[in-house]
Amino acid sequence: MMIKKYFNPSGSITIFLSISLSIIISLIFYTLESCHIDSLVARSEGITYLSLDSLFGQYCLPLFEDYGLFCLNEQGMNLENEIKKYADYNCRTPASILHNTSSFLNLTVKDVNIKKVSYITDNDASEFVKQVCDYVKYMEINSFANTLRDSSNSERPEVFTTNKEGTLELDFDSIDITKANALKKYDSNYNNPSSEDSTDTNNSDSDSGKIPSDLKDNASAYIEHIIKNGLLSFLVDNPENVSSLTTDKSVLPSVTCQLTEEGMAANLGYTKDPTKTTIEKAYFCEYIYNTFGCYLEPEKDSSLNYSMEYIIHGSDEDDTNFINCCSHIINLRLACNLAYLFSDKDKYNDAKKVAKASNILPIPGAEYLTRITILTIWAAAEALLDTRDLLSNKKVPLIKNNDTWTLELSDLTTFSKATISKNNGKNGFTYKRYLELLLATENNISLYYRTLDVIQMNICNKYNDEFRISKCVYSIQADISYLLPYLFTRKKITYKSTGSHRYR
């Protein structure tokens, strides 16, 4: 009777205990599964970004080393397959890689879907400009650091001497001797040219008067030919040495890339963003100055030798770009020289006297117009000499003074190629710096895409004929779908992870 009192034969306690244990075990399993899934989701997010970062590990090395641009060359590459390859490898745990075993943390890549790919030529090359500006900032810092390093590590030049007190002082006699020896070297080369140079000069003189047969039937081309060769023969000693290379522009970004509506309006001159004409453009012009060649520093292994001239003018011919830039420099020098003539009272009065003496007809304002014409011709003649000095690797100050001014008003009657400039060429801007001034006046859109043209031409000639900079990726956004392994459920779980990578 006592046994029946303490033991309930209905079994309600056993059922309640079983239900309680089942609920507790289910909660434990649910918690474990949730933790498992959360860890897999976090791991899949990391794998997505790691795969995209690994993809950009195949960046275009020549583009980075030569021009400081970080991009992925998409040509000959299936981006989805490349991303899937990196994702598959990163899905494996270290244990499965070493022992070829499965793991509860192993993920399986289901598919890859690329949502967006951005190229360096997109959005009016805005990303290209950003990378250039960043590159110039670091380049200036590096240049300054190198200057400090060189100045601290360089040996003392011979022009320094030690006095009785043990301190260094300048020996000006040694400085003069050093300069004299250098000048003597150049003077000997000038006064004793080689026979080959003299032969080339004679040949150039004999060939300069010849007219190509294909120009005889075209009047406009013939006139252009006469003007071009006449200006070249005055500005340079050997016009035949000016590069006549041409290139095919049909595959260049300036032709193939589509501009935005804002870019098209800006390119046509309808709109102008003042913020892009200050710091950003200064950085960009400095980048061109430090990266590309010109007439005095021609490019090697390139479709065109004169890169800066091409960026300014945009013709597919080297000589046309060169002549155009020379004309622009002449116009710039003319304006600067005219400003100096107006500021110099003696020269201005000389022009005024000649204008007054030549004014025969009593027409109001005729004397003033004659005076302005004389000053303009005077400034233009001096500008021709200035441009010739620049092409001879001399410096020319932006605003000249009486010491650097060559022509008097009476010299205009005998002005010719034989006229010798009085400018010593030690102070002022070089030819390449004048080109940089011309760059600052160019349209931004044209400047950006012509620079991309030159980069593409150079890489095509040096590394890969099929290279197209319009296929260079700087940003990518992709979705990667993963199959998550289960622990306590038979239901397959699919998780989609979205990742992106871009230049920062």
Kindly label every feature range from the protein language model.
Residues 1-2, 127:
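Coil-to-alpha-helix initiation sites in intrinsically disordered, low-complexity, charged segments
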Residues 61, 68-504:
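Long, compositionally biased low-complexity segments
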Residues 2-81:
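Alpha-helical assembly-interface signal, strongest on the long, hydrophobic N-terminal helix that forms
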